[in-house]
């Protein structure tokens, strides 16, 4: 402890920033020097898992006594609204944080009422850069008409619903520099829709021009509507877990796509051909779920990941190799749906009629996460490795706990010849 006490204040404050506030204040008992140091910690975290009236008063007291010139972050975790912890208390804590120029705010609330209100001061906080809100068992209401969050770049909302469609649009329209938006159900880490425009600004007018996009997200997250469209110059699009999409407007005219992540299955998901401008693509689909797969050409695609849990993924692989002339990185995985087994490529797997252009010229890395060394798996590996003339890395990650089995896999993989003598073989390693 003497060694730590000799550290400068700024270093001690940084260390204390990673500790829950309740424990930080206990350090005031260590020595005279530590007595007031806790008051200057710029990051505050309160866990209400075992809350009572005494803890509620403690939160008020420690917030009011904090002297940090800028409150870098405030986390209010696992709040349960009841007689001793009320909506007005949460509003008071947020008001204090706003007055201290808070930059990051994260709140998770379990509410028994049908409606929940945030204080009006939050909607005009000029310093807030990140806001993560989780509300269970209620709707967020009373978002003011005038929302102004000019510094907000990241907005994550995990709510069961909104009082009106306009509420969500009104909130987002006030975030004039928003870079990342994520909407999710509060009880499901898998179901989410995320829009991320990296490195650029979403201005006020473009928010309203994207009305269809946000109506789509609202409807799909909370179960309303059946026909929606997306009409927006997005650079990152992600959708997962059986969201039903019936109409994409203008999406095929987006040459600025950077990445599209599609982790969905189901008969209505036939829109893969609409995002042929994507540079990065994650798919968990079979060819039968894609409309006109034979006509798809991904002129810009350089990074492709295919999930191996779906029946017929091997045929999708064939078509994607044939239709992706600039592909540089190919990954096979079943990491996103571990409860489903990886399906083995059948003996009747139809290989490309001719060697795809990407194998002859551009492919640099081939990765298989969850490789099992089955006969069908080996046939896919042999085809790719024997034809990829410019391959630099071949990476295989096995989930087996049997050392002997893994050693046999490694021997078999090492015996497959590659056109490039400098191609590295990495087994159970990412780097």
Curated annotation (Swiss-Prot):
CDD domains assigned to the protein according to its UniProt record, in alphabetical order: F-box_AtFBL13-like
All copies of domain F-box, residue ranges: 1-47
InterPro entries named among the record's database cross-references: F-box-like_dom_sf, F-box_AtFBL13-like, F-box_dom, FBD, FBL13/AtMIF1-like, LRR_dom_sf, LRR_FXL15/At3g58940/PEG3-like
Swiss-Prot/TrEMBL LRR repeat ranges: 52-78, 85-109, 132-159, 160-185, 309-334
SMART domains: FBD
Pfam families: F-box (PF00646), FBD (PF08387), LRR_At5g56370 (PF24758)
Source organism, top-level taxon: Eukaryota
Boundaries of every FBD domain copy: 348-398
Keyword annotations: Leucine-rich repeat, Repeat
Gene3D superfamilies to which the protein is assigned, alphabetical: 1.20.1280.50, Ribonuclease Inhibitor
Protein name as catalogued: Putative F-box/FBD/LRR-repeat protein At4g26350
Organism: Arabidopsis thaliana
């Amino acid at each position: 402890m003497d060694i730590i006490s000799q550290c400068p204040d700024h270093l001690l404050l940084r260390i204390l920033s990673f500790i829950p506030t309740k424990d930080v204040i206990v350090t005031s008992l260590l020595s005279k020097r530590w007595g007031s140091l806790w008051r200057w910690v710029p990051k505050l975290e309160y866990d209400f898992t075992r809350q009572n009236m005494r803890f509620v008063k403690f939160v008020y007291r420690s917030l009011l006594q904090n002297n940090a010139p800028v409150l870098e972050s405030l986390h209010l975790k696992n709040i349960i609204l009841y007689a001793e912890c009320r909506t007005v208390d949460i509003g008071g804590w947020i008001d204090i944080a706003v007055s201290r120029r808070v930059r990051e705010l994260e709140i998770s609330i379990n509410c028994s009422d049908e409606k929940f209100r945030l204080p009006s001061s939050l909607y005009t906080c000029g310093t807030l850069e990140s806001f993560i809100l989780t509300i269970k068992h209620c709707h967020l209401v009373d978002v003011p008409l005038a929302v102004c969050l000019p510094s907000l770049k990241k907005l994550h909302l995990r709510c069961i619903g909104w009082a009106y469609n306009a509420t969500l649009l009104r909130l987002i329209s006030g975030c004039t520099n928003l870079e990342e938006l994520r909407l999710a159900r509060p009880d499901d880490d898998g179901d989410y829709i995320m829009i991320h425009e990296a490195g650029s600004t979403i201005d006020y007018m473009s928010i309203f021009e994207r009305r269809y996009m946000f109506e789509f997200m609202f409807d799909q997250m909370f179960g309303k509507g059946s026909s929606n469209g997306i009409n927006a110059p997005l650079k990152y699009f992600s959708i997962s877990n059986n969201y039903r999409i019936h109409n994409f407007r203008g999406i095929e005219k987006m040459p600025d796509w950077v990445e599209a992540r599609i982790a969905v299955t189901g008969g209505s998901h036939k829109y893969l051909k609409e995002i042929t401008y994507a540079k990065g693509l994650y798919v968990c689909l079979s060819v039968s779920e894609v409309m006109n797969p034979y006509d798809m050409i991904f002129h810009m695609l350089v990074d492709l990941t295919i999930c191996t849990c779906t029946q017929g993924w091997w045929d999708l692989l064939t078509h994607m190799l044939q239709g992706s002339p600039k592909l540089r990185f190919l990954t096979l995985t079943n990491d996103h749906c571990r409860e489903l087994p990886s399906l083995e490529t059948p003996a009747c797997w139809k290989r490309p009629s001719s060697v795809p252009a990407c194998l002859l010229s551009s492919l640099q890395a081939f990765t298989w996460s969850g490789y099992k060394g089955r006969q069908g798996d080996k046939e896919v590996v042999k085809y790719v490795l024997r034809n990829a003339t410019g391959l630099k890395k071949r990476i295989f990650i096995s989930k087996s706990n049997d050392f002997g089995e893994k050693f046999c896999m490694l021997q078999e993989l090492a015996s497959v010849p590659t056109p490039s003598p400098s191609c590295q073989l990495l087994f159970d390693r990412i780097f």
